[in-house]
Amino acid sequence: MNVSVVLPSFNRARLLPITIPTYFQEDVSEVILVDDCSSDNTAEVVKELQTRFPTLRYFRNEVNSKQPYTQNVAISKVLSEYIDCGDDDSVLYPGSIRNLLNVMREKNADIVGGRALALFFPEQIDELDEFLSHYRNRIATEANQIVDLSTLSTNFTYTVKEPIKVPFCHASCLCKTQVAREMQFDVKIEGNAYREETDFLIRATLAGYTIYYTSSANQINLPSAMCSGGARSKNHRHWAENAIRNNDYFIDKNYDSMQKMFSLPRTKDEMKALFRVQIKKQVRQKHIMDFLERIGLFKIIYHIKHKFD
């Protein structure tokens, strides 16, 4: 067993009994949870979980220090050769870590990312096989279907027949510990920490490390209603402002190196402007989903759509 799972966490005590057990898979020697100074009963919940999972290690920041700093603390505590990056609001599908390890060894990769999916309704937690079946025929054959650097757009829901080399993957990934310690997460990425993983991973590629994407591993976000106390966050504008600010910082920091390696077709300013358009579209979509949910139509539309997939 030579994989450490790292889980930064903040005020997710009620989710941890659902998510943490899914990370104790074959090849996992420890799960490290770093509590970013939560105000809920995270410490008590973890203590109870430790009676079932003795290799669950718990650390707590003295002050709230945000996601990148907390990620770095977790990495510093790792005792294994490999790190699996988890989320406190996601479950990991059985067998995912073994499959990530197999791809890493077969491809001599430094980082391997899996699919990143999201449940829509709480009852889907007990129907993961059926949920995953909806993505079976969404097949990608080229890297730019998964990561398009010309627009910085991604789709980590695709099924692939063979692992595909990509410039970066989703945050849900297996990484060599020495690579993670060399790269480190950038603590200047603030607020909602948008682009923290993209920055970490693209810098790994720019440094000469190899990253692959596989659909044989699946990290699945819990429904947003469960993660936000029964309703989606309505502060979409604040989220978008944070995302734009962090994206601008990411582009200013990495554009020249990315341009040199990938010959990007857009200028730095064009990339920033395009992202603003994309974010505005996302916010509109979130408002529409909120409205459909309020009037009880979202679930009906979802099931009709997937009936014909």
Description of each model-found segment:
Residues N61-V78:
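Glycine-rich, basic loop-to-helix element that forms the pyrophosphate-binding segment
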Residues I83:
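Short aromatic/hydrophobic "clamp" motif used to bind/position activated sugar donors
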Residues T22, D35-V45, V63, S90-Y93:
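A conserved acidic beta->alpha catalytic loop
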Residues N11-Q25:
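Short, well-formed alpha-helical segments that are part of the catalytic scaffolds
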Residues G95-A140:
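Conserved donor NDP-sugar-binding/catalytic core segment of glycosyltransferases
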Residues Y209, S216-N221, G229-F262, H287-K307:
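Catalytic core of nucleotide-sugar-dependent glycosyltransferases
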Residues H170, G191-F200:
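Acidic donor-binding loop at a coil-to-helix junction in glycosyltransferase catalytic cores
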Residues T154-C175:
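A recurrent flexible, glycine/aromatic-enriched loop bordering the glycosyltransferase active site
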